[in-house]
Amino acid sequence: MTTLLELKEKLTRFYGKYDIYITPVIKFTVALTAFLLINHNIGYMEKISSTPIALILALICSILPVGGAVFIGSVLILLDMYALSLEVCIVALILFILMYILYFRFSPKNEYGVLLTPICFGLNIPFVMPVGMGLLRELYSMFSLVCGIVLYFFLNGVKQNETTLSGVDEKDAATSKIVVALNQLLGNREMYLVLAIMVVTLVIVY
């Protein structure tokens, strides 16, 4: 535990000293990685799912507050969901509204958590997030971690069920799509287990 506290102090001092140089690079890298992963995994709208567009958007994000990358990423996801299915897009929009309410209410200064958590899951290194946030952020950063986890499992579930969700637009099919999309959140026991483990890990490290 002492070693973790010493590491936390060293990282905080280093970042504070070189903040003006490190921050734009981090913003660009995180945004670009997020946009490329979105394109790779759920790039259903081909017009916006190209590397040049991802690069341009990431450059814009490097001069914006981190919340700008969160907003742009949300728009890209909604457009991709719309290209897949209107019903899924509506469910995603409701999810984002709820997440933004939770995020702005409890953890408005932890935008990186929302972006980096799905990225780390995509790179198969999810436990970097609770450990890193426990070392570098405040305890309330768990809310941005929760938002990131929920977002990852929702998008991963959509990807796994894309054949069903992109079916013909009939009345029964539309209802089925909504049920499938909602089930990625409400019926996902794995997500709830991961949420509990990650939050407990963050609290222990903190």
Give names to the regions the model predicted.
Residues 1-18:
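Short, Lys/Arg-rich, polar N-terminal cytosolic tail immediately upstream
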Residues 130-206:
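Generic multipass alpha-helical transmembrane bundles of integral membrane proteins
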Residues 20-74, 81:
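Hydrophobic transmembrane alpha-helices
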Residues 59, 72-148:
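Membrane-interface helix-loop-helix junctions at boundaries between adjacent transmembrane segments
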